[in-house]
Swiss-Prot record:
Its EC number is 3.4.22.-. It comes from Porcine reproductive and respiratory syndrome virus (isolate Pig/United States/SD 01-08/2001). Residues 69-180 form the Peptidase C31 domain. Disruption phenotype: Knockout mutants display reduced infectivity. This is Truncated polyprotein 1aTF. One of its GO terms (biological process) is proteolysis. Residues 269-385 form the Peptidase C32 domain. The chain crosses the membrane at residues 1119-1139, 1153-1173, 1194-1214, 1233-1253. Its main location: membrane.
Length: 1268
């Protein structure tokens, strides 16, 4: 700009202003030259070189060189004179306005919000805007300490009269309290310092820019304070260090900055915990507060600065609350150092927190409560929780997330090679990843040394679980979400549903904060070098000991192990797999091989095998001895029929249940108990203690000494020791055999009472001395009686039905759970699958009941009291800490007196003996036919579950009903005299729909006709009239009773794998006569069986409508209908193709029309069958009633159609020699269409009740049903 002259000719007393680094006069707008040396005022610094006031002014300017950041240094407010005057004036009063603005600012020597109000800046059309991009036109740029007419590094807001696209700040807003600062350059930062009017020295830092190199260097006396400032506080915050308690070492302090996890602020867990936002939920229950705290941590919203303002507002809205501005409110909102800070704090203290400024007070009210107060908005860029003042327990976990403006220049990520490791896909991939990281840091091997552990489908390691474990192990790893920390050496990524890890080979490890581990740190974060002793010495062993726990408990298990590690002089299984030793590689390879082979051959779970190896290696003094012991484990032969886990382990080392006591009871009557922690004494030495935090511990307790060596394994957790009582298992010798015989005979001759309730609060083990060992007195009967009061954990019965061994299809021998004529064997083998959390009656993702597939590994996380292998209809007791409390758990000694048995009713615990050849007995006993009967039981449970409402399948009443239904089905096989009869009796299950109708489930499946009683009676009458089933033939049964086949013949074809009702007669009818009649009879039967199999193979395996026909007709009827239908379709298509293509001109149009109508008839018939099929699938319970009513009418119409068409075909073939070929085809087609139309009309008349059931409303159904 320029005035009348090129140089100012005004008096030196005329005020000046700065614009773009140049000095101009406020009177003439010309450039002001330097004053003569005798007129210059040194107290005014750079301003004194151009301005000589008439009177002495009360403010001074520090010496400095004018730069872009502050023009001039210490008097940046002089650069605001021109833009303020230009934006608030017109063309005719600009000079007068310029003089007015200069007078106001020169009066105090600074720019403050009061000066803007005095100059009526806001009334004249100016507003503050946050800087989000280039600003056109005139503007005044500012931050919390500095203003300029040009953009500068660290500028956060701009004052302009131009309408910018972003939203203007609400009035009265001003980014600074006083714009009056000195500007220096230090390392990569720009430092602002000033002294406020009350004498408080403030400092602020911003990132450097390209123009920062020309700044004045920071004085040496301020370097220590600036180092504390840049490490402990975020950018653009004017800080007075006197308000804070500081420490010399930054490693143990707290930092508000986004680039450093630690700082010089003294860390107080009761002050800097980031949880002050929970004061908004003080009016709620403690459970709500704990839930909100856990949710913020688990979802990653909790940071060291608190939580996001929008998240806090949303959580209040979810809880039905909101915050309103109330001057008398109990909650006070504060900001860090200035009101524009994004770091907020909520406090209940009336005194202002040092280092913070008070903004307002709020009150939490209900959403539905009318109020006159203004709603408080927490803000989209604010974080609440900086310095909580409420005294709370120390938080073990702190998380962080970056929300501040990151420095523009971030340290580059070093270029290095990347190696990826993909762990085994066994469900524990997340923990294998951590094991691979630790193994590489210790042994240099980037693989997981942990054996595979098959986890349940609903138990997986989340990113929150991995972050917790990484912090416990202090690993230099991060969980990659949208971005990765540049300082992390190991990057853990989720590839679909599988965790993988990458390592940066050429990069040095660094200690990572919570923000870096979670992956929400800033781009320019700085991490200290990784210390030499950063990794715990036994980190790998701690991870190996805890990774089999539930995923949400692994980090707690690692922390418990590191806090109280076991002694190192013994070589346990975990130590052998993880610790460096010459035998580690060979031990690990041999152990993984045995883990894959031995449990499958023995029919045991992987968990049982792992526990057995742990017991074998207990107190092992050296790795050589551990390797020698492992090498003694025998691999069972594939030809062996059945091998127990005990036979695979060396003699003298019981596989399953070596006692955890150092001294066994010397007398069989001695009681062994696991007492509560406050008990002063007990017999024997206590076994392993139950781990804290819900971790399961395995206790092995022998029932008694002797050849039988009856033992029990108890998997118990912290839940079993509530109320100061533990699990007590007593072992005692019976005083006489008559007591056991009376107990056995008391229920032996009674019929099975299906209505007898199972004991819900008593767990009892009953054994009996076998005739094979009459001299043994070791079969004592321990009984643990549990008492409950209705105030704490509940007992839930989770049904485990049906088992299959590892790779063979024959189930295991489970007869011990049902009969009392064999020794009590409580070994853990092939433990059945536990129900999932979503639906305890089904396996997730499949349409199979839970008894189909056994879990391949023993889950340490199952909160169940497991007593070895149970029967298919047995249940596992689970403890839930919600309603009942365990108050008594004392052993009952059966050897003392008869009164001891009076407290326990033997009829409640002794299972009824089933006949030898019943289906359940065959399943329990095992053998070649056990798999067949297990599949039949599978079908029974599946059909029964289909009749239940899906949401009720997990209820105890439904499970009890399922067991009773199976018992009723099993009763039909109680009169069998051969092991082959039960399969044929139960193969078809034709009686099961009627049985379900007679005894419906507690909550039947809902359908359209379920609420109409009149319609139910109508359907019942139709079903009674039309469904007359012929009695089953008993020829096969008589033959089986008279000539029983040898038991060693394998019955592979007793029941087909596809669930059909036919059975092979070849292997079940072996005749001892080798005469020619017998040979002829056998050959005839063999030929018939072969033909039958061929028809089945052709029409039931390779036709899409096979299951459709079979679901509604008998097997023979379905085969004949398919054969005739296929031939009819082929002939008809042949005739249609000939008539429509070659001889279309020889026939009138009505013949072609009838031919096309015949095609549509077949299409409609097929669609009707498909409709019936899908409806029966969607409504199985209702379909049982509908099929009986409809299928005979439909079959009659189908036979009518086929017979008429067959007659037409015969007539056409008979007339073919007498008439032309074309005439015969035409007559056949016309006859086919006419008969098809009649049959189709008849079929529709018969199917209309089916359509009525599906589509008509209930009222129409009632009226029409009554009329019919």
């Amino acid at each position: 700009m320029s005035g009348t002259f090129s140089r100012c000719m005004c008096t030196p007393a005329a005020r000046v202003f700065w614009n773009a680094g140049q000095v101009f006069c406020t009177r003439c707008l010309s450039a002001r030259p330097l004053l003569s040396p005798e007129l210059q005022d040194t107290d005014l610094g750079v301003v004194g070189l151009f301005y000589k006031p008439k009177d002495k002014i009360h403010w001074k300017v520090p010496i400095g060189i004018p730069q872009v950041e502050c023009t001039p240094s210490g008097c940046c407010w002089l650069s605001a004179v021109f833009p303020l005057a230009r934006m608030t004036s017109g063309n005719h009063n600009f000079l007068q306005r310029l003089v007015k603005v200069a007078d106001v600012l020169y009066r105090d020597g600074c720019l403050a919000p009061r000066h803007l109000r005095e100059l009526q800046v806001y009334e004249r059309g100016c507003s503050w805007y946050p800087i989000t991009g280039p600003v056109p036109g005139m503007g005044l740029f500012a931050n919390s300490m500095h203003v300029s007419d040009q953009p500068f590094p660290g500028a956060t807001h701009v004052l302009t009269n131009s309408p910018l696209p972003q939203r203007a700040c609400r009035q009265p807003f001003c980014p600074f309290e006083e714009a009056h600062s000195d500007v220096y350059r230090w390392k990569k930062f720009v430092i602002f310092t000033d002294s406020s009017p009350n004498g408080r020295f403030r400092m602020m830092w911003t990132p450097e820019s390209d123009d920062s190199a020309a700044l004045e260097v920071l004085p040496p006396e301020l370097e220590r304070q600036v180092e504390i400032l840049t490490r402990s506080f975020p950018a653009h915050h004017p800080i007075n260090l006197a308000d804070w308690e500081l420490t010399e070492s930054p490693e143990n302090g707290f930092s508000f900055g986004t680039s450093h996890s630690c700082g010089h602020i003294v860390q107080n867990p009761n002050v800097f915990d980031g949880k002050c936002w929970l004061t908004c939920f003080l009016g709620q229950s403690a459970e709500v507060c704990y839930h909100e705290e856990h949710l913020a941590n688990a979802l990653g919203y909790q940071t060291k600065w608190g939580v996001h303002g929008k998240y806090l507002q949303r959580r209040l809205q979810v809880r039905g609350m909101r915050a309103v501005v109330d001057p008398d409110g109990p909650i006070h909102v504060e900001a860090l150092s200035c009101s524009q800070s994004w770091v907020r704090h909520l406090t209940l203290n009336n005194d202002v927190t040092p280092g913070f400024v008070r903004l307002t007070s709020i009150r939490i009210v209900s959403n539905t409560e009318p109020t006159a107060f203004r709603i408080f908005r927490f803000g989209a860029h604010k974080w609440y929780g900086a310095a909580g003042k409420r005294a709370r327990a120390k938080r073990a976990t702190k998380s962080g997330k970056d929300s501040a403006l990151a420095p523009k220049i971030a340290p580059p990520v070093p270029t290095c090679g990347i190696t990826t490791y993909s762990p085994p896909t066994d469900g524990s991939c997340g923990w294998h990843v951590l094991a691979a990281i630790v193994n590489r840091m210790i042994n240099g091997d980037f693989t997981s040394p942990l054996p595979q552990y098959n986890r349940p489908e609903d138990d997986w390691a989340s990113d929150y679980d991995l972050a917790q474990a990484i912090q416990c192990l202090q690993l230099p790893a991060t969980v990659v979400r949208n971005r990765a920390c540049p300082n992390a050496k190991y990057l853990i990524k989720l590839n679909g549903v599988h965790w993988e890890v990458e390592v940066r080979s050429g990069m040095a490890p660094r200690s990572l904060s919570r923000e870096c581990v979670v992956g929400v740190c800033s781009e320019g974060c700085v991490a200290p070098p990784y210390p030499a002793d950063g990794l715990p010495k036994r980190a790998l062993e701690a991870l190996a000991s805890a990774y089999r726990l539930p995923s949400d408990c692994v980090s707690s298990g690692i922390a418990d192990f590191l806090a109280d590690p076991p002694p190192q002089e013994f070589w346990t299984l975990d130590k052998m797999l993880t610790s460096p030793s010459p035998e580690r590689s060979g031990f690990s390879s041999l152990y993984k091989l045995l883990l894959e082979v031995v449990p499958q051959k023995c029919g045991a779970t992987e968990g049982a095998f792992v526990y057995a190896v742990e017991r074998m290696l207990k107190d092992c003094p050296s790795p050589e001895q551990a390797m020698a012991l492992l090498a003694k484990i025998k691999v069972p032969s594939s030809k062996a029929p059945s091998v127990s886990l005990d036979e695979c382990f060396p003699a003298g080392v019981p596989a399953d249940f070596e006692p955890a006591f150092q001294e066994r009871p010397r007398s069989p009557g001695a009681a062994v108990a696991l007492c509560s922690p406050d008990a002063k004494g007990f017999e024997g030495t206590a076994s392993e203690e139950a781990q804290e935090s819900g971790h399961k511990a395995v206790h092995a307790v022998p029932l008694a000494e002797g050849p039988n060596n009856e033992q029990v394994q108890v998997v118990a957790g912290e839940q079993l020791e509530l109320g100061g009582c533990g699990l007590a298992i007593g072992s005692a010798q019976s005083s006489s055999d008559s007591k056991r015989e009376n107990m056995h005979n008391s229920r032996e001759d009674e019929p099975l009472d299906l209505s007898h309730p199972a004991p819900a609060a008593t767990t009892t083990l009953v054994g009996e001395q076998t005739p094979d060992n009459p001299g043994s007195d070791a079969s004592a009967l321990p009984i643990a009686v549990r008492g409950f009061v209705p105030t704490g954990p509940i007992l839930r019965h989770v049904e485990h039905c049906g088992t299959e061994s590892g790779d063979s299809s024959s189930p295991l021998d489970l007869s011990f759970a049902q009969t009392l004529d064999q020794p009590l064997d409580l070994s853990l083998a092939a433990w059945p699958v536990k129900a999932t959390a979503s639906d305890p009656g089904w396996v997730r993702g499949r349409c199979e009941p839970v008894f189909l597939k056994p879990r391949k590994a023993f889950s340490d996380g199952d909160s169940a009291l497991q007593f070895g292998e149970l029967s298919e209809s047995s249940s596992v007791i689970e403890f839930d800490q919600t309603k009942d409390t365990l108050v008594a758990d004392a052993p009952v000694d059966l050897t003392t007196s008869n009164e001891a048995l009076s407290a326990v009713d033997p009829s409640e615990f002794v299972e009824l003996r089933r006949p030898r050849h019943s289906a359940q007995a065959l399943i329990d006993r095992g053998g070649p036919l056990a798999d067949v009967h297990a599949k039949i039981k599978n079908r029974v449970y599946e059909q029964c579950l289909q009749a239940c409402e899906p949401g009720s399948r997990a209820t105890p009443a439904t499970r009890e009903w399922l067991d009773k239904m199976w018992d009723r089905v099993d009763m039909k096989t109680w009169r069998c005299t051969s092991q082959f009869q039960a399969g044929r009796i139960l193969a078809s299950l034709k009686f099961l729909p009627d049985m379900i109708q007679d005894t419906p489930p507690p909550v039947p499946r809902k359908n359209r006709a379920s609420d109409n009683a009149g319609l139910k009676q109508l359907v019942a009458r139709w079903d009674k009239k039309l469904s007359v089933t012929p009695p089953p033939k008993s020829a096969g049964l008589v033959l089986d009773q008279t000539v029983p086949p040898p038991t060693d013949i394998q019955q592979e074809d007793a029941t087909p794998s596809d669930g059909l009702s036919h059975a092979s007669d070849f292997s079940s009818r072996v005749s001892t006569s080798w005469s020619w009649k017998g040979l002829m009879l056998s050959g005839t039967r063999l030929a018939g069986s072969a033909g039958q199999r061929l028809m089945t193979w052709v029409f039931l395996k390779f036709t899409p409508i096979s299951q459709l026909l079979y679901s509604h007709f008998s097997r023979r009827g379905a085969l004949w209908l398919q054969a005739i239908g296929c031939l009819q379709v082929l002939f008809y298509l042949l005739s249609c193709s000939v008539v429509l293509t070659q001889y279309s001109d020889a026939f009138p149009y009505w013949v072609s029309f009838l031919v096309l109508c015949g095609v549509f008839v077949w299409v409609f018939l097929v669609l009707g069958w498909l409709l019936l099929y899908f409806y029966s699938r969607l409504h199985p319970t209702q379909s049982v009633l509908l099929v009986t009513t409809i299928r005979r009418n439909v079959m009659l119409s189908f036979w009518l159609l086929s017979s008429a068409n067959f007659g037409n075909l015969c007539a056409a073939l008979w007339l073919a020699p007498q008439v032309s070929y074309v005439s015969s085809l035409a007559s056949y087609s016309v006859g086919h269409v006419i008969s098809g139309m009649l049959s189709y009309v008849y079929a529709c008349l018969q199917i209309w009740p089916f359509l009525l059931f599906m589509w008509c409303p209930k009222g129409v159904v009632t009226s029409v049903g009554e009329s019919v």
